[in-house]
Amino acid sequence: MQYKDLRDFIGHLEDIGQLKRISHPIDPHYEMTEISDRTLRAGGPALLFENPIGYDIPVLTNLFGTPERVAIGMGRKDVLELREVGKLLAYLKEPEPPKGFKDALDKLPVFKQVLNMPTKNIRKAACQQIVWQGDDVDLDKVPVMSCWADDVAPLLTWGLTITKGPHKKRQNLGIYRQQKLSKNKVIMRWLAHRGGALDLRDWMETHPGEPFPVSVAFGADPATILGAVTPVPDTLSEYAFAGLLRGSRTEITKSISNDLEVPASAEIVLEGYIDPTEFADEGPYGDHTGYYNEVEKHHVFTVTHITMRKEPIYHSTYTGRPPDEPAVLGVALNEVFVPILQKQFPEIIDFYLPPEGCSYRMAVVTMKKQYPGHAKRVMMGVWSFLRQFMYTKFVLVCDEEVNARDWSQVTAAMSQHMDPARDSLMIENTPIDSLDFASPVVGLGSKMGLDITKKWEVELALSPNVECSLTSSEQIEGCIAEITKMCPEIIEIHLQNDNANMVVVSINKQAAGNAKKIMDAIWAQFEENKFVIVCDDDVNVSDWNDIIWAVTTRMDPARDTLFLQSVGETSKMGLDATNKWEGECLREWGTPIKKDPEVVAKIDSIWDELGIFK
């Protein structure tokens, strides 16, 4: 189904019960986040807050709060159909000429889709029905959300930032958060490798000291929004890809104050410039990791014009501990990634980015193994093939019969097929997300690959598997009692898959180095143990959503992994997934996001009136 603009999409979602209008007055500061978070975690509808307290502009949240709504926004009936989108992207990334007449006929549908790629220029665009400029520019009139109690300022989140490098033929669309500073200034937070940052860098080289034009569009049609977060080939513009998704050309219009082309149907557009010499401290903000990030300097975006539709809608979201809307988007886009990877690596059966791993910090791959060392090639491929995976800290590679999305199967394969030291690959000093406070320094850290496949004979030649006697169920209870006696800080011990091969422990951490003490105690009791994961008391050791979140947010693999090797014995691996204390890390550690009890109580008191699930 085609959606010509955001309002068309909202209307369809409302018709199928996937959008709820909230007429009750709600404060954009904290209250909308609490309501949106509860709704998303329950798999609920998109929300349109019609009466934000203190503002005349409605606020739309949770638009892509379920994978199904992402699929609908891409014009697909269900999530599985997103693999067809991935196949199209894989084809466009590396097109193959027809092998003959019949093959050409088979490819006709693709060629017809490509015809929808050119954009269509609109002179009198809806997004410019109202224009604020000069002293009329006032972001205080826009209901920009404040999400968490310790956020430094309101945060603009869903804007499509449009830039163009001086040497590029096409524009770049990216989504970068923007801290509101004043009526006409925000901080543009983009990572160094992202398109907008690269465009600015090129501009500063060719136009030193000159202002860099930027436009930011809020509330575009769903295909354009999703085109900005999808891994489109470098040769394809996001607008062109949106045309492919929609089945019709993307309508654009020139900004009033610069030459950048913006979505013609956008609800609100900010136009202005970045002064290459103007910076400001950004943050802290509660982000998608579940923590507040560090304060960093970023460029300031000065807004010279605000254009909008009549009676505009402000599209917003929040980020927090998974699941949040970015995590849900990650689940849906995961299906797009699979065919792209399979075209390059046909041996890949499935590819999974667990949302609890912040949607990109861990990848589980299943493959049809074809030669010794094959798993390591796949690890390297994941890290190097797509920019989206350059920050993936952990890559787990399993055989094809393992369900990559079932932790009981993945962990069983780890226990059965791995010698931890032999089958682990560690790479240090690699690019890491600057928001990852667990890395030793900003932007640089380590990555770990785990080869969970069955080993071939040649792979065992230098390091054969060692058989260990299993602790009986009768003995396990006594061993656990001894461990807890030695380590009173232990809160709970979980034996994954009902044996001691893999043990997950939660502790009330008392000092730096506590995790190693726990590992040593477990290894002293369980000869067969291969893996110990030590977590803090806020982790449910029976819940792999909790465990993976702790592992991916609180570990630098090289620093926080301990190997124990003895001649004639299977090696052992200990993962310290606790929050690090002074002396255990160099950087300021992240502070977990905590909800404001007063806000929670306020929403509790009006929850039934909202009728979100009625």
From Swiss-Prot:
Gene3D superfamilies: Single helix bin, UbiD C-terminal domain-like. It is an enzyme of class 4 (lyase). GO terms for cellular component: cytosol; plasma membrane. SUPFAM superfamilies: FMN-binding split barrel, UbiD C-terminal domain-like. Its cofactor is a divalent metal cation. Its main location: membrane. Pathway: Cofactor biosynthesis; ubiquinone biosynthesis. Belongs to the UbiD family. One of its GO terms (molecular function) is 3-octaprenyl-4-hydroxybenzoate carboxy-lyase activity. Residues 460-584 are annotated as: Unknown insert. PANTHER family: 3-OCTAPRENYL-4-HYDROXYBENZOATE CARBOXY-LYASE-RELATED (PTHR30108), FERULIC ACID DECARBOXYLASE 1 (PTHR30108:SF17). The keyword Transcription regulation does not apply. The keyword Lyase applies. Its EC number is 4.1.1.-. It is a peripheral membrane protein. Homohexamer. GO terms for biological process: ubiquinone biosynthetic process. Keywords: Cell membrane, Decarboxylase, Lyase, Membrane, Ubiquinone biosynthesis. The gene is ubiD. Catalyzes the decarboxylation of 3-octaprenyl-4-hydroxy benzoate to 2-octaprenylphenol. This is 3-octaprenyl-4-hydroxybenzoate carboxy-lyase. It is found in: Cell membrane. It comes from Aliivibrio fischeri (strain ATCC 700601 / ES114) (Vibrio fischeri).
